[in-house]
């Protein structure tokens, strides 16, 4: 059993309580993040706001993660595991409570930002803790268990919130989450142990400023580009991306010239870590763009209700969650290559089928395709991530997890922005060929055409990942 107590040379960790604390907090955090997505239409009506405005509930969340996660490597070296866990849960509880009571959009946006502070602290802490408390030959299975939570929570989020919205209102999405977060905090206070060493390196303010400008600018720019208000030609988007890229270059130069960098980019001298980062980046682009495109296609192309759309996506998400521990164990036994290559083959084939869906495609077909997509993703994500982190020496763990989690946020922003832009262009091209664009029957067909174009982009990204997968090697851990 993967949650059995494992030992470090000088210290005994109670692995089961630590893992339960992390899994419970992570589950509710990921659930809260995705459960709100299906309520955005209701929020637009109730709060009398536009689509571009309501999108800030997602953009603001991603922006905070994009700024906070890069700093997490420094925080992990300054504060104990218990301190970071407790503070992350307090932020999550406070944000959820404010959201449950929110009388206006401003309050709800503020609540989402506070929630993001909690998630931004928790995600790197989860991965870093696993690297410390589990020996290398058990990390795959442990990462798989974390994967179960990370994938299972978003799977049931839309279905659950669709059910809540049918009988209650969006406030209850937060009220129902609140007691579970409190339970996670109480459990963590009782059982969480300090597993990381607090070396308290010197804080370089300029590094934090450059990191905030660099990562924040890129996430903000891509998120705004995907909202459709001006798109890629918007001055806000162009300036944000330029400032972000310049900030990122200056940040990288400073980190490589410092004796004690905030984020040690020398982790990139390990080839399997680089390849692992690329695989995870591609995987996140595919999965997050698909999570955006499929609900839009199901509701706009096949004209299903929000609840029905959630049910269609439920089997794939659940199976993905349960596949993660299985692929984790297979990784421990066989290494990454024989999981990641077949995984990318499955993902590429499924995305080709998705690029050919029509307004007459059946819900059963979408369930089968989505389930296969999730199986493929589960074969790639955790094995690639674990193999990459395994090559790093112990002192690089906080930096490695910070780099991985930061680039996942960027992948999400980039993947969804490009997918939405391609979808909008595909819709526009289709409408330009129609004799009567005002015909309501044309709208689902136009949206479906846009979705087809966007899935072609996702398929090309997956093919790049497949090529990279052939270069993966199992890391021999000697540290």
UniProtKB/Swiss-Prot annotation:
The keyword Ribosomal protein does not apply. GO terms for cellular component: membrane; plasma membrane. The chain crosses the membrane at residues 19-41, 56-78, 85-107, 112-134, 141-160, 170-192, 205-222, 232-251, 272-294, 304-326, 338-355, 360-382, 403-425, 449-471. The keyword Signal does not apply. It is a multi-pass membrane protein. One of its GO terms (biological process) is response to antibiotic. It is found in: Cell membrane. One of its GO terms (molecular function) is transmembrane transporter activity. Pfam families: MFS_1 (PF07690). InterPro entries: EmrB-like, MFS, MFS_dom, MFS_trans_sf. Keywords: Antibiotic resistance, Cell membrane, Membrane, Transmembrane, Transmembrane helix, Transport. Belongs to the major facilitator superfamily. EmrB family. Proton-dependent transporter. May mediate the efflux of lincomycin. NCBIfam families: efflux_EmrB, MFS_efflux_LmrB. This is Lincomycin resistance protein LmrB. It comes from Bacillus subtilis (strain 168). The lineage of its organism: Bacteria, Bacillati, Bacillota, Bacilli, Bacillales.
């Amino acid at each position: 059993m993967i949650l059995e107590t494992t030992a470090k040379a000088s210290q005994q960790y109670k692995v089961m309580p630590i893992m339960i604390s992390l899994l419970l907090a992570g589950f509710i955090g990921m659930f809260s993040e995705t459960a709100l997505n299906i309520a955005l239409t209701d929020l637009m009506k109730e709060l009398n706001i536009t689509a571009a405005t309501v999108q800030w509930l997602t953009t603001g969340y991603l922006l905070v993660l994009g700024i906070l996660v890069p700093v997490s490597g420094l925080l992990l070296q300054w504060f104990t595991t218990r301190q970071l866990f407790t503070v992350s849960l307090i932020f999550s509880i406070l944000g959820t409570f404010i959201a449950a009571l929110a009388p206006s959009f401003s309050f709800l946006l503020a609540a989402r930002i506070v929630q993001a502070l909690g998630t931004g602290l928790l995600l790197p802490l989860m991965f870093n803790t696993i690297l410390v408390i589990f020996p290398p030959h058990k990390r795959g299975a442990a990462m798989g268990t974390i994967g179960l939570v990370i994938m299972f929570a978003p799977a049931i989020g839309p279905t659950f919130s669709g059910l809540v919205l049918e009988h209650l209102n969006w406030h209850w999405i937060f009220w129902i989450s609140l007691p579970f977060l409190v339970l996670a905090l109480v459990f963590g206070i009782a059982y969480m142990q300090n597993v990381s060493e607090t070396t308290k390196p010197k804080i370089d303010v300029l590094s934090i400023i450059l990191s905030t400008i660099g990562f924040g600018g890129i996430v903000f720019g891509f998120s705004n580009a995907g909202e459709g208000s001006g798109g890629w030609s918007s001055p806000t988007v162009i300036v944000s991306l330029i400032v972000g890229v310049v900030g990122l270059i200056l940040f990288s130069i400073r980190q490589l010239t410092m004796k004690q960098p905030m984020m040690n980019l020398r982790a990139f001298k390990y080839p399997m870590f680089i390849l692992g980062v690329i695989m995870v980046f591609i995987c996140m682009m595919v999965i997050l763009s698909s999570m955006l495109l499929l609900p839009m296609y199901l509701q706009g192309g096949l004209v299903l209700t929000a609840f029905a759309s959630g049910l269609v996506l439920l089997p794939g998400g659940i199976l993905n969650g349960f596949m993660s521990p299985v692929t984790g164990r297979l990784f421990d036994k066989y290494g990454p290559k024989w999981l990641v290559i077949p995984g990318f083959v499955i993902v590429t084939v499924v995305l080709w089928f998705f690029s050919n869906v029509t307004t007459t495609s059946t819900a059963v077909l979408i369930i089968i395709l989505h389930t296969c997509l999730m199986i493929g993703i589960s074969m790639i994500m955790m094995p690639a991530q674990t193999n990459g982190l395994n090559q790093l020496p112990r002192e690089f763990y906080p930096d490695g997890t910070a780099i991985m989690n930061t680039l996942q946020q960027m992948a999400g922003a980039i993947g969804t922005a490009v997918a939405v832009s391609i979808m909008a262009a595909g819709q526009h091209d289709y409408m330009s060929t129609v004799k009567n664009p005002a015909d309501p029957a044309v709208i689902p067909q136009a949206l479906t055409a846009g979705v087809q174009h966007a899935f072609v982009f996702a398929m090309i990204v997956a093919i790049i990942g497949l090529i990279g997968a052939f270069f993966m090697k199992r890391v021999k851990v000697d540290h």
